[in-house]
């Protein structure tokens, strides 16, 4: 399923959506946080998707448990370290880990900049122990409003040298992208790349706004682009990458089934598209699972899967020399 001569990457992967079940259990007990279960085994269904359940509300509840146990900065550092370990152990050559410091800080009123520093420190520690290339993407969580995002941005830009890009995530319908135009002007001025969750809950106009006003060169999910032929042409012509997460889209009810997923439509239209895990801790998947699904459920051939792998490397927020180094390591 995976072509071993091509680097394997995961570009849309939430660090705060990938907390191990045993880590939630241990941190909960360490900090006296009431958990919804009385054993490690019975905790799993509260924090991971089991079977075929597909509901955005259920998904977000599980996600919330992942940050509920971040009681101090050491917990944040541990989770960041384990994210590097998990990326390496799942066979990835390169991953971009994105995180929302406000979301991670809010339950226990941690300092936002302190959370950013703890993530950076945890990743650095992980890279000493594991063979994988990692870059970080900062998230502004739009659901908490403009002021919270401004705070979040301050904490992230204070450490911009450790980031490759900024993302906008959260409630796309309640907090449209135009509320954050000024925030992203600061991101562009700081020299960071931009990706945005768009066209997931809202229509194609949300994607146009992210590209034309925020400055996004990649779009997270973007499933609703397929209803706008002009946008599809634009995406293909300008090599705007779609960070696709099929299993997550199913789990959040963004699509009703794998058969309904537009991945194939994007490929046939010549749009640059990659496979990603989104919140692997919640979905209980790894990148290889997404490639298996792409073959068995989305109907991609081995040649098309190889192209998707190459697309991921092309879409990555890397320099040309870094891209070449990834390929050279596979030779």
Swiss-Prot record:
A UniProt-annotated Pfam family: A_deaminase
Cofactor note text: Binds 1 zinc ion per subunit.
Catalytic reaction equation(s): adenosine + H2O + H(+) = inosine + NH4(+); 2'-deoxyadenosine + H2O + H(+) = 2'-deoxyinosine + NH4(+)
Cofactor (UniProt): Zn(2+)
Binding site for Zn(2+): 12, 14, 197, 278
Keyword field contains Glycosyltransferase: no
Keyword Zinc: yes
Active site: 200 (proton donor)
Official protein name in the record: Adenosine deaminase
